[in-house]
């Protein structure tokens, strides 16, 4: 899966791994968050794991700030930053350089965005891209016609600021990422998820979740995570263990589906099925090599 691939690539490209997962930041929650183990890590540095107490809120804005810092530090060491796993919106804060906590989502921005979305629906992606091409040819060369979301984001910035998008810090950030997605047939994926949940139970998830429950986990940010909140009704004696475990499996499958949908909506994701085609790993390495030479 993602963890194994990120570690393989870190060895190959002198990389360091940044976790893009909103739950792996919490200390003491190792099994339910599928946190990388010290054995798996080996000598590969990992970041943004075990940095919060269970009562702390962790936001996308905080993730972006910390991840940006780590990316800079890793790059200064001449290592390759590899962001593994992840919560869709967290990753988007990096790939789109979202200015969180600013007025980015104010009314004017929303109106401009909705206008271009409507134009794209009525006249097609190419028409919208041509408009960008006229206004900012440098940006249009770097943004694929198929990636309407980024084309609209560029038009939005141009219209709102009166400046070229290619002169904005966002422009640089949107081009500094190579997105690699792992996929496989849905039945295979779901079967793996079910088995993984069974394994978590065997490895002590019940004890971990009970500890969180005893700390008042139902009212804590960390208690919202999949694998924990489904067990709380069981600890209260309201449902059977079987029902709770089935609910974890169901929620995990839904989450995986949402993650895949998020990546599929990002036109610049490159997909590989290394479960069915293990040799695809060589293709991924070649891909990264080519990208690094750009």
Across the structure, where does each feature detected by a protein language model lie?
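Phosphate/pyrophosphate-binding catalytic cores of soluble transferases and nucleic-acid-acting enzymes
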Residues: 1-294
């Amino acid at each position: 899966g993602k963890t194994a691939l990120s570690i393989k690539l870190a060895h190959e490209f002198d990389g360091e791994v940044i976790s893009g997962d909103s739950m792996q930041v919490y200390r003491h929650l190792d099994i339910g968050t599928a946190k990388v183990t010290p054995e798996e890590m080996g000598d590969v540095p990992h970041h943004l794991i075990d940095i919060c107490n269970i009562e702390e809120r962790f936001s996308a804005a905080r993730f972006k700030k910390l991840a940006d810092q780590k990316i800079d530090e890793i790059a200064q060491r001449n290592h390759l930053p590899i962001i593994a796993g992840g919560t869709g919106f967290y990753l988007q804060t990096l790939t789109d350089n979202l200015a969180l906590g600013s007025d980015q989502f104010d009314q004017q921005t929303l109106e401009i965005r909705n206008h271009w979305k409507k134009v794209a629906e009525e006249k097609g992606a190419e028409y919208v891209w041509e408009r960008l091409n006229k206004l900012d040819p440098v940006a249009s060369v770097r943004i694929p016609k198929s990636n309407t979301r980024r084309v609209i984001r560029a038009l939005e910035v141009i219209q709102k600021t009166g400046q070229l998008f290619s002169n904005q810090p966002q422009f640089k950030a949107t081009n500094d990422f190579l997105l690699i997605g792992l996929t496989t047939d849905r039945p295979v994926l779901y079967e793996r998820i079910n088995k993984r949940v069974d394994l978590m139970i065997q490895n002590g998830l019940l004890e971990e979740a009970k500890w969180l429950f005893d700390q008042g986990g139902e009212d804590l940010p960390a208690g919202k995570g999949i694998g924990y909140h489904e067990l709380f009704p069981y600890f209260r004696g309201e449902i059977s263990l079987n029902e709770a475990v089935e609910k974890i499996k169901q929620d995990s499958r839904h989450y995986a589906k949402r993650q895949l949908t998020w990546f599929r909506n990002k036109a610049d994701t490159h997909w590989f099925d290394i479960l069915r085609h293990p040799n695809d790993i060589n293709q991924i390495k070649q891909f990264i090599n080519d990208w690094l030479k750009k």
